[in-house]
Amino acid sequence: MRKPTRSPKKDINLPLTTQGLFKVKFTGIQAKISFRCDTFLIDKIKNTLASQHLAGNYQYPNLSYFFRSALHAYQHGLPLTYQRELNNPRKEISFRLTEELMTFYNSLPLNSRTEIMERALGSFYYQYL
């Protein structure tokens, strides 16, 4: 009987872009961060991404890419217009960042990182999705 063999993994580097001014290709993803985020906001983003994927729009291929895009937009001047809902349940979310975004994330005030990240996600969601 013949042993099953695995074919080598294909390295596919397709350019991924975001809408508007924020055309970014996230390569060299290095570090991982975790924070507690509003579950209702995450569910809204997931549902919107799923409906866009069903319509054939893969501008944001997954949730992590959307998070990186939101942080990148905030780094380049996205105004934080989203107000946090402090009474909503929270869920631990983790995703990876590029070295440049990780440096920017670490430069944020330690006590305000979660708030800034959540507000950046909400602002980016309502402005670009």
What annotation goes with each model-predicted range?
Residues 1-89, 98-129:
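A detector of short terminal or domain-flanking linear segments
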Residues 91-93:
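C-terminal extensions
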